[in-house]
Amino acid sequence: MIEVALRLGLDKPAESRRVVLRQGEFGNMRLRLVVCEGGMAKDVSLYDAALCVAGLCVEVPCNIADGVVFLTVPKGLTAKAGKGRAYVRLSQVSDGTADDADTVQTDVITTQTFELEVLEGVQP
């Protein structure tokens, strides 16, 4: 399994990263996405995570282990060639406040973006 590790900031620094995949390949690469805040790794264990890719119109649920976001590249992510800007969306549902116990609040934060490119697959 090939692992690609990225550090993605919540403060959205200007520097950009790039991940290149091949059309039709899936299950053989894992993205390890460390979410940082103020330059320090943030424990995201209490969040739900999804990789969102604008341009490719893809949203993929991710796993979280030891406070780090992991995604084994699924078939849907490499179904077609193209480029997009990707980011991790973290969401956390919390119960209502003391004033309104019936409400449910969802807090959402996003990381900086990175370029995700899916190259054309090799044709037989």
Enumerate the language-model features and the residues they cover.
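N-terminal assembly/attachment segments of tailed bacteriophage virion structural proteins
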Residues: 1-123
